[in-house]
Amino acid sequence: SNLDIDVTKTTTLSMNIAGNVNNASKPYTGLGSAGMLINMYYSTPFSSPGLVDGKLVNASTDYPDLRMPFTGGSGMGYYGGGFMRTSNNTLNADVQLKQKLDFITKGLSFHIKGSYNSGFTSYTQASASVATYTPVLQEDGTIAYKKYGQNSQLKYEDKDPAKSRDWYMEAALNYAREFGNHHVSALLLYNQSKIYYPSAYSDIPRGMVGIVGRATYDWKNRYMAEFNIGYNGSENYAPGKRFGTFPAGSFGWIVSEEKFWKPIKSVVSFLKFRYTIGLVGNDSFDGNKQRFLYMSDPYVVNNSSLINRDGHGFLFGINNSTVSPAAYENGKNNQDITWEKALKTNLGVDANFLNDRLRTSFDYYHEKRTDIMLSDGTAPSVLGFTPPLANLGEMRSWGWEITLKWNDQIGDNFRYNVGLNLMYNQNRVVERKEAPQNEEYMYQKGRRLGSRSQYKFFEYYNSETTPAHYKEVYGTDMPEQLVSDLKNGDCVYVDLNNDGKIDSNDMSRQFGFTDDPEYMAGLNMGFSWKGFDVSMQWTAAWNVSRSISSVFRQPFTDRTNSDQGGLLEYMLNHTWTPENPNPNAEYPRATFINDTNNYAESTLWEKDAKYLRLKNLQIAYNFNLPFMKKLKLNTMQLALSGYNLLTFTPYFWSDPESKASNSPSYPLTKTYSLSLKLGF
């Protein structure tokens, strides 16, 4: 609920309260929210026929003919395993008081604001097991079932509830006033926040405090300037380094407001140049999983390991000596760590043409990040400990964005619009403090963040043609591969350092793209005609790739690499085989023996994840009926909407837009909705 109260002519009180309660129930799989789907990925068609006469039937390798070396996973692995129920309750509330202070000076005002959010999630889960049955063929041709295990009662398990709570408050003085053609404004704001139950040291809340100042000026809405400064404090740093100062400034010039622009204003109706530069700070690292890294080094006693005599302690006596507990250094801290910083600049141009029917915008940005927290990989191992985090990293990012929007009308009833935006993003790691490597191409420094270390795939091995082909391309003999007994259809990799063998020194970060697209585009189109409204949105991305996980690349292998996984249909249809030795097959020869060679990290498994997607489509009709006036009904709209309707992509393993699509995850769903909107 939202409530706005005019307490006096100069005082306004606003309150907003929202809450949510939801309950969910799902089978207990032990594999997370997508457990049922993951079971399907890991299953094989010969692992289980499912339920037969109420019995869960599983195949077995224990047959006289020994024709089944393994059965693989079962798509019914979750059956009878129990359940998990969650109950989630959230509360969000905020209140704001605004007070005009014109009696002090015109344009001065004051406001205070506070918000409070809390959440509580309880879990009820119980596990169980059911008897399984294995079919056994009898001499007379009938099938008997051998029983394994017993049906067990549900066993309820304890799981701690999840809690969340935070509050935020601010107090600010605002000033805005016009002096003829001069417009000025200023802001002075204090804010403070606290987050309870953080992931690290959950008993100690996280706290932030800051002061913000802002001043703006414009003359005739033609020349504009703004200056901001932030002074923020974080608990993550030692006294003396806890607070950081972060200034920013922006400038703008609307050229089309100048007198000399009038002759061409009918063509270029609006033109604005703008420039922004600012320094921002970041105090979170490692997903906020680490805190207080400036404090004294922590020590730990590992008593459980001492029982087995493999922990840290002192031995007294001979043979069956007594272990006396002792502490060991759990990590090294650094009192000199401070804020990560980013200097951001943006240069932009806005231009409208043909009486604002065509609106365009162009932005170029550059960001230089310094003092990035990381551990020094160049430190020698003789130190005997992992170096502490320090402000050692540096990175650059840059790119541009173009936006085009066209709005027009044909006749009295038909209006249409088209909008296109295109973005380019690039970055480079300037300093990473990586461990020394034998080859330059092994470093992430100088390359895009997220570049992959992988072998360069050459071709599938053919004993008659590959050695000669390799020598023709690279001028040297084909190197020794990761396995000595190479078979036709196995992967052949390129010897990047020309030492005659393939090893970790041939893994390079210079190939392919990353999980983040370099180019992204969007297209919005729509029209309205005699009560009908039609709109659609297309999105696209390219110069992006995914390195598919072992479940997607290696048949019969699950996430534990126990060789008990699934055989997916596209593996069967796109694998090199002696019967179909396709040199362009997606998959090499299926093998367990040479799996370390064929399924190693390489460019073969880096798949193009570009896509074009119809994100949403809506067809609506706006009614204008006589009875609406009697009911004081201003609008009545019936709309049919669709979401994620079409996707065109060469990446068929999962949703190409998701970074998690390189491994089994919940699939993308199409959504259709029918809505009726009433306005009074």
Name each region found by the language model.
Residues 10, 28, 100-110, 123-125, ...:
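Short loop/turn motifs that connect adjacent beta-strands in outer-membrane beta-barrel proteins
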Residues 76-77, 541-638, 642:
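Extracytoplasmic gating/loop element in the C-terminal half of outer-membrane beta-barrel translocons
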Residues 19-23, 92, 114-122, 190-198, ...:
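Transmembrane beta-strands of outer-membrane beta-barrel pores
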Residues 262-341, 352, 357-395, 433, ...:
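Solvent-exposed loop/turn elements at secondary-structure boundaries
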